[in-house]
Regions:
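Glycine-rich phosphate-binding loops of nucleotide-dependent enzymes
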Residues: 1-251
Length: 251
């Protein structure tokens, strides 16, 4: 159970498993608990009851850094609020989660060259368009900001990558690139949880789709066995049987 900012239960009695080597998409109309679920999984929101397991370990009460160190990657829904410090350099943003580890830090001192070296490698690998690795993150386009976040998260080789609205507001080229990177993670045997309000994105990227309605997962379907019409009906509160009966009536 997870409450929203008003203290109202936004996630209720939810049970979901994401396996290695698959992308699970969370589909639902905005406001049905998806954002609160992602925040709870990533450590940005407390849960009232229940548990969160990552590779068999209970991470329910762990702070965000320890979840990250335990193998959780997170592409946040709001890249400006939770993904980047816009006034800081791109290199600093890329190293922000591992700044206390070698080679970025040694004996309590930061190694500026190591930050730049890391940023240059990821800029090249993830095609981040920037005039300099030290330019302020806020000076980049939305697509390049998102690529930088994805580069930072994937470079840590997380066991589970949570991607919340990863392509919102981006152009077609950036969208295709990000989809490819998510699928690459799946193909490497990683678990990927994708939350999106765009049904075509869910259908194009996910292997299984969990539909949320009023804070609960009402159904989980194989992507190959469903379609946009059925998902839309489930998102509006219909059962699978009701949705398929309505589809038959429409034929």
């Amino acid at each position: 159970v997870v409450k929203d900012s008003r203290g109202i239960e936004a996630v209720k009695g939810l049970d979901l498993t994401v396996r290695h080597g698959e992308v699970v998409g969370i589909a639902g109309v905005d406001g049905n608990g998806q954002s609160e679920l992602i925040q709870a999984l990533s450590g940005l929101r407390a849960i009232e009851s229940g548990s969160i397991q990552l590779d068999g370990k209970d991470i329910t009460k762990l702070p965000t850094r320890q979840r990250t160190e335990g193998g959780l990657g997170h592409i946040p829904e709001d890249r400006h609020k939770h993904g980047l410090v816009l006034q800081m350099g791109l290199d600093e943003n890329i190293g922000i989660q591992t700044y206390y580890k070698e080679p970025l830090s040694k004996n309590g001192f930061l190694n500026k060259k190591a930050f730049v070296d890391l940023a240059e490698r990821l800029i090249e690998e993830f095609d981040v368009r920037t005039p300099s690795p030290t330019v302020a993150a806020g000076a980049l386009s939305g697509g390049n900001q998102q690529k930088a976040i994805i580069a930072r998260e994937i470079d840590r080789d997380p066991s589970l990558l949570i991607a919340a609205q990863p392509t919102r507001g981006l152009d077609v080229g950036a969208i295709e690139y990000i989809h490819k990177r998510l699928i690459d993670q799946r193909n490497k045997g990683k678990a990927v949880l994708l939350m999106s309000f765009e049904l075509d994105e869910i259908l194009n990227v996910a292997d299984r789709i969990a539909v949320m309605y009023e804070g609960r997962i009402v159904d989980v379907l194989d992507t190959k066995e469903t379609n946009e019409t059925e998902l839309g009906l489930l998102m509006a509160g219909s059962t699978r049987e009701q949705a398929r009966a309505k589809e038959q009536e429409a034929l």
